[in-house]
Amino acid sequence: MGVTIVLGSQWGDEGKGKITDMLSQQATLCCRAAGGHNAGHTIVHGSNTYDFHILPSGLISPSCVNLIGAGTVVHVPSFFKELAALEEKGLQGASKRVFIADRAHVCLDLHSVVDGLEEARLGGRKVGTTGKGIGPCYSDKAARRGIRVGEILDEALFERKLRNLESGYRARFGDLEYNVEDEITRFKEYRKILGPHIVDQLAFLQKYKDSPNTLVEGANALMLDLDHGTYPFVTSSSTGLGGAVQALSLNPTSISSIIGVVKAYTTRVGSGPFPSEQLNEFGDKLQSVGREFGVTTGRRRRCGWFDLVLCRYSQAINHYTALNLTKLDVLDDFDEIKVGVAYILPDGTRTENTIPADAEVLDKVQVEYITLPGWKSNTMGVKKYEDLPANARAYIEYIERGLGGVPVKWIGTGPARDDMICRE
């Protein structure tokens, strides 16, 4: 099995869907390793725009089988709603090519209610979650009281565990705007149609052990990783290389490439430190030109300059073999473009390669920038590297050098499926 892993290198929304879509055309199997319907990928394919949340993007390729892995949390209503939306847009037979590991956990409507209550209790210290129930679901998993997807098929077991969860949350929060009987009733219907999608992950993957091309699609990004991200302003799963290996039982020696996806600038949704954020006309312009609104929440994304410190840190943890730089065209009309190259910590320490673990310290760092000239010309839809303006090529090559020579093999130059330069 030759495995390619695609990972977000910043705070998510880097545009992982397009490279995943492109690579899935040659893949036999596409797997999601972690996260849930809090993730969001947009793929423009012909005249259709597809929004993916819990489903793997490999569904667009008619020859690619797709697995939602053991490290994920699955909101069953969203799973079926998303499948129906894809089939309505012409992806006929998609439902026959997607499977769920029986060890994945069930994200309930109950978890979404609890998510809102937990955020409300934090007041001004909100994490800024998507409100989808991801955190409470992973909390139940860690506390060993969660419900696994395979347990949905055992009606008595499922109902007993769900009632126990509801009872525990009522003891904690008091009255809940939630009716456990309604959720139980909905799952009576899901149970009838979910069975064919549920698989023993290890046995399933064994069938593909000789596959020359397996694609692993990362969700969220390294800076949202539970261990390595800007804790506590993170998601509740392991979003990096280690999480993918663990969740899908990958043999590390089978990994042929690790692709880090980086936006040509930096964005973040929700709360938390963001050293290179631009709360000025530059940030507003990036937001407007880049149409920076979250696929999952619709929230306005915070915008800032490219941060080499953050990306060096990400590279050190995820060990990228190549990069996909996205949305280069958004920078077309800037006279000058800044790149963050170092942080000055509150105590005066200068760092180029790592970030402080303390979110409050990270929030107070000063960023040291270099300024590069813009190219002030259109790169939208450019297909060849040599056709890019000289200053655009200089920008890309500066990033490559700043990340120790990791090659930028793919460059996104627009929203369409084929708006991609391949430097193979």
UniProtKB/Swiss-Prot annotation:
It is found in: Cytoplasm. Its cofactor is Mg(2+). Gene3D superfamilies: Adenylosuccinate Synthetase, subunit A, domain 1 (3.40.440.10), Adenylosuccinate Synthetase, subunit A, domain 2 (1.10.300.10), Adenylosuccinate Synthetase, subunit A, domain 3 (3.90.170.10). It is an enzyme of class 6 (ligase). Keywords: Cytoplasm, GTP-binding, Ligase, Magnesium, Metal-binding, Nucleotide-binding, Purine biosynthesis. The active site is at 13 (proton acceptor), 41 (proton donor). Mg(2+) binds at residues 13, 40. This is Adenylosuccinate synthetase. It holds the Pfam family Adenylsucc_synt. One of its GO terms (molecular function) is adenylosuccinate synthase activity. Binds 1 Mg(2+) ion per subunit. One of its GO terms (cellular component) is cytoplasm. Plays an important role in the de novo pathway and in the salvage pathway of purine nucleotide biosynthesis. Catalyzes the first committed step in the biosynthesis of AMP from IMP. Homodimer. GTP binds at residues 12-18, 40-42, 301, 327-329, 412-414. InterPro entries: Adenylosuccin_syn_GTP-bd (IPR018220), Adenylosuccin_syn_Lys_AS (IPR033128), Adenylosuccinate_synth_dom1 (IPR042109), Adenylosuccinate_synth_dom2 (IPR042110), Adenylosuccinate_synth_dom3 (IPR042111), Adenylosuccinate_synthetase (IPR001114), P-loop_NTPase (IPR027417). Substrate binds at residues 295-301. Pathway: Purine metabolism; AMP biosynthesis via de novo pathway; AMP from IMP: step 1/2. Belongs to the adenylosuccinate synthetase family. It catalyses: IMP + L-aspartate + GTP = N(6)-(1,2-dicarboxyethyl)-AMP + GDP + phosphate + 2 H(+).
